[in-house]
């Protein structure tokens, strides 16, 4: 089941990636930390697999973390934050990290996440703060049962 969940999650993420650029202006210049200067060499598919294979997330929590991550991702879209080839790795790794901190009983520290994701501890801390600000400090985004069901159906 876990492998199937990850594959479906990857398919969902691939359908969310767009060529649309995130427009940076005075109101949202904090998003710069979420955008890579250069397109990462590792594909988003391999990057997601690496995160889930690392055992940093308990396998029994995969589904909950995936659903929570997709929910947060949908909320970010309403803020004009999209996944593209320069932002997907940073946004997804940070959203998965935030989701694991909510779901996992004993989540790993940011140092472990930084090492796994190939960024500095300072960068992961900045990305975490940025996403929390963009999410209006609300990691428990409340959605209707129908919206939750739609997200679940889109993945599974």
Predicted regions and their residues:
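Acidic, Ser/Thr/Pro-rich regulatory low-complexity segments at or just upstream of the first helical elements
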Residues: 1-86, 114, 125, 129, ...
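Alpha-helical bundle/repeat cores within regulatory domains of eukaryotic proteins
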Residues: 88-94, 99, 103-121, 128, ...
């Amino acid at each position: 089941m876990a492998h199937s969940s990850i594959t479906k999650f990857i398919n969902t993420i691939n359908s969310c990636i767009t060529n649309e650029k995130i427009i940076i202006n005075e109101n949202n210049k904090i998003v710069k930390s979420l955008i890579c200067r250069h397109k990462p060499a590792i594909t988003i598919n391999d990057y997601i697999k690496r995160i889930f294979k690392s055992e940093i997330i308990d396998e029994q929590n995969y589904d909950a973390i995936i659903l929570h991550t997709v929910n947060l991702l949908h909320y970010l879209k309403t803020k004009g934050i999209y996944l593209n080839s320069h932002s997907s790795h940073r946004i997804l790794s940070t959203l998965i990290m935030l989701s694991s901190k909510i779901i996992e009983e004993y989540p790993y520290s940011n140092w472990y996440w930084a090492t796994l994701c190939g960024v500095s501890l300072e960068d992961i801390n900045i990305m975490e703060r940025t996403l929390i600000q963009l999410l209006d400090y609300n990691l428990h985004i409340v959605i209707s049962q129908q919206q939750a069901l739609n997200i679940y159906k889109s993945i599974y």
